[in-house]
A protein has these predicted regions:
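Asp-based, Mg2+/Mn2+-dependent phosphohydrolase catalytic module
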Residues: 1-15, 23-41, 52-76, 83-274, ...
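N-terminal phosphate-binding loop and flanking beta/alpha elements of the actin-like ATPase fold
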Residues: 44
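Short, intrinsically disordered C-terminal tails of secreted or membrane-associated proteins
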Residues: 296-306
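Intrinsically disordered, low-complexity repeat segments enriched in small/polar residues
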Residues: 273-274, 280-281, 285, 307
Length: 307
């Protein structure tokens, strides 16, 4: 059973956004302090999001509006992963029909990719994103292109996107609808594929042991970390509830109620001058945060061994 020293020793924190740090326009309690604590300890965080409906600049604007100072370089999106994949597969010159927002199309065009809205053009591939501007015409065009044999890619497999009033269909739900109509399934680019994790580690020079991924979804966030070979933290502030763990083939390394619980653990740490890792005693308050959130992940030995 993992001990809490592993959580405190991390240097690269890969963070989901929706359901992990905020919900719509509400920043979760402790989120801003958690990010500040990471940097004050000399750590690095990167935001990984499957949401292709907006560019990194809009996330920067949103987080600043919510009280978090950040930069475009702090983000890696499923659109970034899509561009990298197309280039790696020699598809950078292919003609794409994109079912996505104008923001997504603008990002792809700025990356030098060729796009068309004409289903009768010589389309090489259909790309499905989280399209908040989706129309029936786009769905019809997608079916026609898939029936013609166009290559088929999707930015993410998420079934739903959380909002303040509940959930709305995400890219995965639309892809399932297209499957029912055409029998075609896409090659999925974003989480749970490990590409964004590996890219973030490579850019920062971090090892797998130094890296942790935090997210609220088992089948995308946590599976992504597992596929990349890094520790994962499931937070119960978004889509996944603790009851969902029993029936899941994907299991996180740790389960916490929210990022505020991780903050409680970090706040107990004092770095020894000669150490990169943190091994300060954990208080009953911080221990309780983990125990309450994940009794089946809790080990009293992990605390006793640090006293």
């Amino acid at each position: 059973m993992p001990d809490l020293a592993r959580l405190r020793a991390k240097r690269l924190f890969l963070l989901d956004l929706d359901g992990t740090l905020y919900l719509d326009e509400r920043l979760f309690d402790g989120a801003a302090d958690f990010l500040r604590a990471i940097r004050s300890r000399g750590g690095t965080y990167r935001f990984l999001t499957n949401n292709s409906s907006r560019g990194a600049e809009s996330y920067v604007e949103k987080l600043r509006r919510l009280g978090v100072e950040t930069e475009i370089s702090d983000f890696l999106t499923s659109v970034d992963a899509l561009v990298a994949h197309l280039r790696a597969q020699g598809m950078a010159e292919k003609l794409l029909y994109v079912c996505g927002t104008q923001s997504m199309k603008r990002q792809l065009t700025q990356a030098g990719l060729r796009l068309t809205d004409d289903r009768d053009a010589a389309v090489d591939a259909l790309v499905m994103g989280f399209d908040t501007e989706l129309t029936f015409q786009k769905l019809e065009d997608a079916c026609i292109l898939l029936n013609r044999g166009a290559d088929y890619l999707a930015t993410n497999p998420d079934w739903v996107c959380p909002t303040w009033y509940g959930f709305v269909p995400d890219c995965g739900s639309v892809c399932e609808m297209l499957f029912r109509a055409t029998g075609r399934r896409p090659y999925v680019i974003g989480k749970p594929r490990p590409d964004m994790v590996r890219l973030a580690m490579a850019r920062g020079g971090f090892s797998a042991e130094e890296t942790v991924l935090l997210g609220d979804r088992l089948y995308t966030d946590i599976a992504c970390g597992v596929n990349a070979g890094i520790d994962t933290v499931l937070v119960l502030s978004g889509e996944t509830k603790e009851a969902d763990l029993a029936g899941s083939a994907v299991q996180p390394t740790f389960v916490l109620g929210s990022v505020a619980d991780y903050l409680s653990i970090l706040q107990e740490c004092k770095k020894r001058p000669h150490e990169r890792s943190f091994f300060a005693p954990i208080s009953p308050a911080a221990a309780g945060a983990v125990r309450r959130a994940a009794p089946h992940r809790w080990s009293a030995r992990a605390v006793k061994s640090q006293r």
